[in-house]
């Protein structure tokens, strides 16, 4: 399981993201992360929260995470949000869900071109990185989000933070809800 949270504001959003992600702590027990966009560009922090609460781990990061838009997550799996640089520009991405056909998508990515993935412990590929790779196969983030949702067998809800704002995409079956407002 996991939970994701995002904020776009006219003022600093750091505390809103901090407390919004902390509120989701009951949804995951292994990793927590936050990414914000501000005057200095993207800033990110990811911590292991297996033995220490989210608030305790991230309290010291708040001064470095200054911006007016941000996303964060609690995850039982991979570390995230990830910072991506591609032909679509720079963005941060976080996901919650399960990709049932992950091995097939990875194999297809290797067969179709020049791509690599960072390997995690145990030889696993970060599913959030795989989603970013799918998105990056298209000409825009919106086209990429649609393409990723079409290719994924399973459930994947996604937040993407760009310098312009946040893209939110609920999984196509509605298993993992997303609230905007």
Identify the function of each model-found stretch.
Residues 1-181:
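Conserved short alpha-helical segments that host acidic/polar catalytic motifs at enzyme active sites
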């Amino acid at each position: 399981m996991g939970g994701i949270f995002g904020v776009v504001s006219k003022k600093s959003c750091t505390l809103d993201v901090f407390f919004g992600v902390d509120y989701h702590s009951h949804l995951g027990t292994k990793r927590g992360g936050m990414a914000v966009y501000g005057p200095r560009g993207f800033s990110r922090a990811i911590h292991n929260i297996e033995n220490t609460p989210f608030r305790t781990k991230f309290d010291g990061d708040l001064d470095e995470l200054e911006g007016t838009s941000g996303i964060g997550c609690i995850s039982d799996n991979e570390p995230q949000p990830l910072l991506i640089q591609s032909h679509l520009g720079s963005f941060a991405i976080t996901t919650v869900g399960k990709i049932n056909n992950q091995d097939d998508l990875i194999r297809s990515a290797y067969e179709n071109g020049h791509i690599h993935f960072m390997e995690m412990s145990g030889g696993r590929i970060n599913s959030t990185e795989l989603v970013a790779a799918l998105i990056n196969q298209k000409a825009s983030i919106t086209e990429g989000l649609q393409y990723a949702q079409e290719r994924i067998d399973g459930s994947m809800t996604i937040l993407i933070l760009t310098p312009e704002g946040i893209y939110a995409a609920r999984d196509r079956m509605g298993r993992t809800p997303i609230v905007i407002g």
